């Protein structure tokens, strides 16, 4: 295992990411994950927002953007998996290189830019999954969408994934999509929030909805958003 990790670190980080996920998928299909990555189920389950998580360790959005690795990641025993960020239309994301490894800091920085295969592809993947744990779906807007079209992108994704998501995350935080963080302003956030609230009712979606904000946003802006919610 250490040899494999050492080899992956010699490769560009995005290629390492690709190889690792596909290797995990092969191990899953060969029924080898439980042998190579044994885990126990002794962790105490807990409830949050009406959902029952078998443990507190999960997969955040960004690792499996398109739901291609739900079953293999689920076999590792995570308490939840969040897929995405997904957009209505497929898009390639930013030009490469766009993932950067900082070994001394034990860190990776990504500037992927919402690269994904589109919401219709994701829906096919989650419909056919074997994974039965908590599934979150992270939704976003296409790079070329502005104004009302950007709001429409979120609504389209919401409508298409709501039947399959245990919770939905509305991602307005990405610095890699030009103008997306303008949705943090009250005048732009309110129309989005009202549209999401409306589609939640029409789709009869009673599960949690989370808003992903920029981690370095000013506290006053966050306060305005929470007041609106």
Where are these regions (language model features)?
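Flavin-dependent oxidoreductase catalytic cores
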Residues: 1-229
């Amino acid at each position: 295992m250490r040899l494999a990790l050492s080899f992956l670190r010699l490769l560009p980080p995005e290629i390492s990411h690709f190889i690792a996920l596909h290797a995990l998928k092969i191990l899953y299909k060969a029924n080898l994950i439980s042998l190579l990555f044994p885990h126990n189920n002794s962790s105490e389950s807990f409830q949050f927002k009406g959902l029952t998580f078998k443990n507190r360790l999960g997969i955040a959005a960004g690792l499996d953007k398109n739901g291609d690795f739900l079953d293999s990641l689920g076999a590792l025993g995570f308490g939840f998996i969040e897929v995405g960020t997904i957009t209505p239309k497929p898009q390639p994301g930013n030009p490469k290189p766009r993932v950067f490894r900082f070994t001394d800091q034990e860190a990776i920085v990504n500037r992927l830019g919402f690269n994904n295969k589109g919401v219709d592809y994701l829906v096919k993947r989650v419909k056919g999954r074997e994974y039965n744990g908590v599934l979150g779906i992270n939704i976003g807007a296409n790079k070329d969408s502005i104004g009302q079209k950007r709001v429409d992108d979120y609504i389209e994704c919401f409508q298409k994934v709501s039947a399959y998501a245990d919770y939905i995350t509305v991602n307005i935080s990405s610095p890699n999509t030009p103008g997306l963080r303008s949705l943090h302003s009250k005048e732009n956030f309110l129309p989005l929030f009202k549209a999401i609230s409306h589609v939640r009712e029409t789709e009869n979606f009673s599960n949690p909805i989370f808003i992903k904000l920029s981690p370095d946003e000013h506290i006053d802006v966050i306060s305005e958003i929470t007041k609106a919610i």
